[in-house]
A protein has these predicted regions:
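C-terminal flanking tails of non-heme Fe-dependent oxygenases
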Residues: 5-187
């Protein structure tokens, strides 16, 4: 988790001049502590279980394992296992794209997603990317859908960090996350 945090902090440092040109260098990275009561960074183990041939055959065409969504954090690092496919990103999201591009695992590679928090912080200079996990094709020899494992590190700013931008009112990262959680239950 420490190495993931360091990598995400480095990515934020590299993005900052473009994302938040008025910031002092290091402002974004410094707003993300890994440990302590103010920290909100999270490491999540994602498991999509295998499915029997009968269960897989009962699903409608175009089913997915995780529906289209964006991440709430600043940056997500996704570690995928080689040979376990399914992650897709919307192509050209500024234009309401319905086409999806696969993000196949690469040995030693890490998929990086910009999240909603960084999109807000940057006044939309960086867009959070819409992504999903599609249902892979069943194995031809068995008809079963294979398992998928991945690790996601969500680099979320500290609860007390102030997200300030020109287009929207300031909000603490803690209140931002609480607002996102609440929005799930108000629909």
């Amino acid at each position: 988790m420490t190495k993931s945090h360091a990598l995400a902090a480095r990515i934020l440092t590299l993005l900052e001049p473009r994302a938040c040109p008025g910031n002092a260098p290091g402002t974004l990275a410094d707003a993300h502590t890994l440990w302590g009561p103010d920290g909100q960074c999270t490491l999540r183990h994602l498991h999509y279980p295998p499915m029997s041939a009968a269960r897989a055959a009962s699903l409608p065409p175009g089913s997915w394992r995780a529906g289209a969504h964006t991440d709430w954090c600043c940056v997500t690092l996704l570690f995928q296992r080689v040979g376990e496919f399914g992650l897709e990103c919307a192509a050209n999201p500024r234009h309401g794209a319905t086409e999806w591009a696969p993000v196949d695992p690469v040995r030693g590679g890490v998929a990086v997603n910009v999240g909603d928090m960084l999109s807000r912080w940057s006044d939309g200079r960086l867009l959070s990317n819409l992504h999903r996990v599609r249902m892979p094709a069943p194995k031809p020899e068995t008809g079963e859908v294979p398992v998928r494992y991945s690790l996601a590190f969500f680099m979320q700013a500290d609860k007390s960090a102030m997200i300030q931008c020109a287009e929207q009112p300031p909000i603490t990262a803690g209140d931002y996350i609480l607002g996102r959680i609440r929005s799930n239950f108000e629909k």
